[in-house]
UniProtKB/Swiss-Prot annotation:
Glycans are attached at residues 100, 128, 153, 274, 355, 372, 461, 507, 554, 566, 585. One of its GO terms (molecular function) is structural molecule activity. The surface (SU) and transmembrane (TM) proteins form a heterodimer. SU and TM are attached by noncovalent interactions or by a labile interchain disulfide bond. InterPro entries: GP41-like, HERV-K_env, Retroviral_env_glycoprotein. Retroviral envelope proteins mediate receptor recognition and membrane fusion during early infection. Endogenous envelope proteins may have kept, lost or modified their original function during evolution. This endogenous envelope protein has lost its original fusogenic properties. SU mediates receptor recognition. It holds the Pfam family GP41. ERVK-19 has a type 2 genome. The HERV-K(HML-2) family contains type 1 and type 2 genomes depending on the absence or presence of 292 nucleotides at the 5'-end of the env gene resulting in Env proteins of distinct sizes. Despite their overall retroviral envelope structure HERV-K(HML-2) type 1 envelope proteins lack a predictable signal sequence. Subgenomic RNA transcripts coding for full-length envelope proteins have been detected for both type of genomes. Residues 90-632 are extracellular. This is Endogenous retrovirus group K member 19 Env polyprotein. It comes from Homo sapiens.
């Protein structure tokens, strides 16, 4: 191998670090303490408020008074820092940063709505004119005109068929209906004088119950006065229409499809041919159609009606009664007479007057009904909170039991400007919902128990050190607990999820309360009192729920119950369906959940508030006793003897040290006395005094 090859295979030389100063400098800066990491539960603190600083100053002053320390600016600052340090230095258990406590919460009157169904009780609908339309009256609606017509998108569920009006599947169709009264006349050519009212009503599909016999249909017949067999006679005041509820001989079907079967037992008056006693063929069918192609045109354009026939005209299904629809399938619900007051106000009503005359044509009697109209009456119907009207392109899906509507409007009143190209859905505010709420601490029934528990954790975790700290600062456990309680409440930061629910529910509470305020000018009216009673009934139901529940101390507008949320038992899809208002087999079983929550609340009610916390404090104070520490160590006789010998040895050692210190003190005292005597002599005796001092000290 030649030298050149040996040189190529030689290992490379190591580079020398000429300047090691930077490394040394970095080594000097290295520390072994743990780096302060930002935990997930760490929150950005807000600047202290004036009230917090004032309270902190009061606590510091009280602490200095208890410890009998002079109040100076320095001592006040140190006391305040100690109080803050005491509050923020409470130990956090392992894994508490990632802990997540989820409980069931009851939120009353959330910002949610649900559809009014055929199984709900009738609602109050107010009209502005009780002369032509029966029912409660209120001519001061709407209460907030500036809020009428607000846009909204809805997607809600339902259990029973919802109440909907309009030309759409699942909604009751509108139609024109007539109500007629007659006044007998003595004229030889005029049989009767008629007064008739035409207005928007509910459209019948068939005249009689479909798929039901007469006998079977009678079981759905409501209790009430049967309609008269004669046409009601006009009262003396021709400007007043007397309404009298009655039950017709047969019912009409308003709806019979997959959404349910809805019937009405109110009379549906129309003109018929009276064929009794006629020998020739007599068409007994009704003449005036029950349904017009254009509803508004039939009420606006046609101001004259003339019916002619060789057979006498008779008004069928007599009676002046309003429609009262009710559902009979798949469930049976109550009557809803209030729906007609909404439809009749969607267009003005028309007032007719006329008569039936008798003539002779071709030697046969000829009957003519002549009706004319020149008077219309505009109407307005309104509902009051918690009820509202959703107007727009409403779509009801029976398969999924959902109702959707995009770009709809929220209204409380309907008048003659309404367009029947839209649909009307009755909705109301939700009385309350059950939702899971997460917190970063366990459920507590009162703030005192929460604070005592946290302080006691810190005391017991550092009991042996904390006892000497208490002795050093001359501060008792009661003072520490009181200080931590007040300062902890002042510096407390709520959980974000609870804050979200709180703000969510607080805004809706303000909204419903503002809408439900009763006008002082109408406070004496009986209708407002009735609506207030309905509203107060919902409030009482909510209060009844809250009185039965044991709630967490840190919430006021809604109730966090002690029932832990079990995701495996109630998955979030069930909660979502509950929020949407759907009640099917997959929806949250509210009745079962209420039973579980009430049982959990009763279990917490059996405990006297504060008893458990006070018992914990007593146990904590017992653990602070040093004698208990010795007892735990000295559990055998041999160890006890050893401890006694150690104590005697320590006592003997203390006695010997005390005697030695006493001798040294006596020697120093004698020396000082000798020095004092010598200092009084003159200079000639100084040497002697020094020798005497030396002799005295050496003795």
């Amino acid at each position: 191998m030649n030298p050149s090859e040996m040189q190529r295979k030689a290992p490379p030389r190591r580079r020398r670090h000429r300047n090691r100063a930077p490394l040394t400098h970095k080594m000097n800066k290295m520390v072994t303490s743990e780096e302060q990491m930002k935990l997930p539960s760490t929150k950005k603190a807000e600047p202290p408020t004036w009230a917090q600083l004032k309270k902190l100053t009061q606590l510091a002053t009280k602490y200095l008074e208890n410890t009998k320390v002079t109040q100076t600016p320095e001592s006040m600052l140190l006391a305040a820092l100690m109080i803050v340090s005491m509050v923020v230095s409470l130990p956090m258990p392992a894994g508490a940063a990632a802990a997540n406590y989820t409980y069931w919460a009851y939120v009353p009157f959330p910002p949610l709505i649900r559809a009014v169904t055929w199984m709900d009780n009738p609602i109050e609908v107010y009209v502005n004119d009780s002369v032509w339309v029966p029912g409660p009256t209120d001519d001061h609606c709407p209460a907030k005109p500036e809020e009428e017509g607000m846009m909204i998108n809805i997607s809600i569920g339902y259990r029973y068929p919802p109440i909907c009006l309009g030309r759409a599947p699942g909604c009751l169709m509108p139609a024109v209906q007539n109500w007629l009264v007659e006044v007998p006349t003595v004229s030889p050519i005029s049989r009767f004088t008629y007064h008739m009212v035409s207005g928007m009503s509910l459209r019948p599909r068939v005249n009689y119950l479909q798929d039901f016999s007469y006998q079977r249909s009678f079981k759905f017949r409501p209790k009430g006065k049967p309609c008269p067999k004669e046409i009601p006679k006009e009262s003396k005041n021709t400007e007043v229409l007397v309404w009298e509820e009655c039950v017709a001989n047969s019912a009409v079907i308003l709806q019979n499809n997959e959404f349910g079967t809805i019937i009405d037992w109110a009379p549906r008056g129309q003109f018929y041919h009276n064929c009794s006693g006629q020998t020739q063929s007599c068409p007994s069918a009704q003449v005036s159609p029950a349904v017009d192609s254009d509803l508004t045109e039939s009420l606006d354009k046609h101001k004259h009606k003339k019916l002619q026939s060789f057979y006498p005209w008779e008004w069928g299904e007599k009676g002046i009664s309003t429609p009262r629809p009710k559902i009979i399938s798949p469930v049976s619900g109550p009557e809803h007479p209030e729906l007609w007051r909404l439809t009749v106000a969607s267009h003005h009503i028309r007032i007719w007057s006329g008569n039936q005359t008798l003539e002779t044509r071709d030697r046969k009697p000829f009957y003519t009904v002549d009706l004319n109209s020149s008077v219309t009456v505009p109407l307005q119907s309104c509902i009051k909170p918690p009820y509202m009207l959703v107007v727009g392109n409403i779509v009801i899906k029976p398969d999924s039991q959902t109702i959707t509507c995009e770009n709809c409007r929220l209204l409380t009143c309907i008048d003659s400007t309404f367009n029947w190209q839209h649909r009307i859905l009755l909705v109301r505010a939700r009385e309350g919902v059950w939702i899971p709420v997460s917190m970063d601490r366990p459920w507590e029934t009162s703030p005192s128990i929460h604070t005592l528990t946290e302080v006691l954790k810190g005391v017991l975790n550092r009991s042996k050190r904390f006892i000497f700290t208490l002795i050093a600062v001359i501060m008792g456990l009661i003072a520490v607990t009181a200080t931590a309680a007040v300062a902890g409440v002042a510096l407390h930061s709520s959980v974000q999820s609870v804050n979200f629910v709180n703000d969510w529910q607080k805004n809706s509470t303000r909204l419903w309360n503002s809408q439900s305020s009763i006008d002082q000018k109408l406070a004496n009216q009986i209708n407002d009192l009735r609506q207030t009673v309905i509203w107060m009934g919902d409030r009482l139901m909510s209060l009844e729920h809250r009185f039965q529940l044991q709630c967490d101390w840190n919430t006021s507008d809604f109730s966090i119950t002690p029932q832990i949320y079990n995701e495996s038992e109630h998955h979030w899809d069930m909660v979502r369906r509950h929020l949407q208002g759907r009640e099917d087999n997959l929806t949250l079983d509210i009745s079962k959940l209420k039973e579980q929550i009430f049982e959990a609340s009763k279990a917490h009610l059996n405990l006297v508030p504060g008893t458990e916390a006070i018992a914990g404090v007593a146990d904590g104070l017992a653990n602070l006793n040093p004698v208990t520490w010795v007892k735990t160590i000295g559990s055998t006789t041999i160890i006890n003897l050893i401890l006694i010998l150690v104590c005697l040895f320590c006592l003997l050692l203390v006695c010997r040290c005390t005697q030695q210190l006493r001798r040294d003190s006596d020697h120093r005292e004698r020396a000082m006395m000798t020095m004092a005597v010598l200092s009084k002599r003159k200079g000639g005796n100084v040497g002697k005094s020094k020798r005497d001092q030396i002799v005295t000290v050496s003795v």
